[in-house]
């Protein structure tokens, strides 16, 4: 009976949108898959964070090679957009911490920096002129740096922490958002990193040594591709079961709605049928920008960026982000086969 109840709640949530009247405000958290300019601010200001109340402007110079997915959502819906994502971020530096010389400190993480920055900004009406429970959606996309090279994939996590610790951190992020009055949550699950040129085995066209994994060829790349597949699918399964469990069974966020956006399946569908999504000649195994792992000199493809699934060996392209944004809006409105929404 428990499972039928949860399924019914999911169906009802999709139909009613759980009290979300209109997407007037979008607030995002994450890493380079979402960041527009926040890490750049740290770099350009000697490692200092943006002061509370400062709105960082939009940018089409992101890890996608253009606009990031959140900006596409804001442009298509007219939503007021506040983005706290930082390139290089993990969920918490207490689990995965990676130093970044350009800012003379570890990459700022979601729980340790992004959430406090968001909380500080809520006091500024210029940033949040109309933030209410029924008109604001909070989205999190985090995990690429938690699971990858220099993290769980290479056994670089803090002693005593596990992938379950990372998943628990994700739920804690939403605890903090809930405390500020947030009631509409979207969790974008792990992208198919195992298909990215960075983590794909060299025998199937994956990169060798890379700017993001300098000694990849010292590893059994087939073994590590399958290891990444295991990690992403296991985490996504934990998300699928964890969201309704915490929301409906444990009543962790009373009165909230929680959507799981299956980006993993969406991007695998693009990979399987690229001509449906990408410009010709569609390319889902190569990259638009190739950078030398030693000199960091980069060369761009002569083909259109819109024909590539991957901008570089780790980051989805601007076209991929545009696809993600289109489906994100559908997920929020309960109109996507890539989304499941639960309500408490």
Describe the residue ranges of each PLM region.
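Serine-esterase "nucleophile elbow" of acetyl-processing enzymes
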Residues: 17-93, 318, 337
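Conserved SGNH/GDSL esterase-like catalytic core that processes O-acyl groups on lipids
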Residues: 53-168
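A structural motif corresponding to the C-terminal end of an alpha-helix
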Residues: 72-79, 173-186, 223-224, 230-260
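Fungal secretory targeting signals
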Residues: 1-20, 344
């Amino acid at each position: 009976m428990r499972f039928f109840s949860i399924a019914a709640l999911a169906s009802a949530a999709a139909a009613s949108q759980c009290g979300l009247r209109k997407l007037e405000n979008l607030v995002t958290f994450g890493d380079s898959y979402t960041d527009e300019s926040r890490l750049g601010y740290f770099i350009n200001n000697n490692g200092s964070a943006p002061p509370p109340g400062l709105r960082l402007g939009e940018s089409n110079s992101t890890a996608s090679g253009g606009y990031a997915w959140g900006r596409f959502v804001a442009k298509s819906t007219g939503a007021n957009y506040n983005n706290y994502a930082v390139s290089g971020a993990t969920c918490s530096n207490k689990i995965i911490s990676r130093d970044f010389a350009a800012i003379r400190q570890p990459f700022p993480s979601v729980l340790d920096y992004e959430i406090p920055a968001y909380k500080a900004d809520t006091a500024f009406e210029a940033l949040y002129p109309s933030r209410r429970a029924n008109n604001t959606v909070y989205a999190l996309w985090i995990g690429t740096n938690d699971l990858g090279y220099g993290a769980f994939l290479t056994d670089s996590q803090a002693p005593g922490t596990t992938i379950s610790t990372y998943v628990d951190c994700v739920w804690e992020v939403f605890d903090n958002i809930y405390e500020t009055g947030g009631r509409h949550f979207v969790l974008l699950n792990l992208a198919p990193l195992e298909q990215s040129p960075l983590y794909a085995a060299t025998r199937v066209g994956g990169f060798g040594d890379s700017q993001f994994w300098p000694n990849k060829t010292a590893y059994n790349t087939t073994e590590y591709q399958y290891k990444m597949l295991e990690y992403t699918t296991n985490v996504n399964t934990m998300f699928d079961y964890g969201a309704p469990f915490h929301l409906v069974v444990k009543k962790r966020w009373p009165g909230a709605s929680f959507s799981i956006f299956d980006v993993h399946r969406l991007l695998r569908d693009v990979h399987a049928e690229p001509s449906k999504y990408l410009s010709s000649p569609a390319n889902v195994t190569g990259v638009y920008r190739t950078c030398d792992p030693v000199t960091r000199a980069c060369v761009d493809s002569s083909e259109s960026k819109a024909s590539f699934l991957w901008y570089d060996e780790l980051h989805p392209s601007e076209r991929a982000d545009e696809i993600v944004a289109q489906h994100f809006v559908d997920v929020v409105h309960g109109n996507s086969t890539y989304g499941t929404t639960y309500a408490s």
